[in-house]
């Protein structure tokens, strides 16, 4: 899909909004969440506009997984957590707020106060 001119993540992808990228690949980038649930809460975002996981082409799946692992490993190495959760909300009924597909990496530490989702 093309970029959506009104989408905040598309604006970040195009460099229209200043951000501190954690990492970047050919088709994905990672930034810290602006309203973190825990210290080190990061987002994995496709550079192209896709609304949900179901819209991301299968041929990008391996890159997305490898990139997610790279970012999670970096967060762990930097001391943000001793474990982590991966969360992806797909559509409003499931809690998606920004309608641009993105994956949350939530570094976890003992006693961080974040309740388990499942």
Residue positions per predicted region:
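HIT superfamily nucleotide-processing domains
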Residues: 1-118
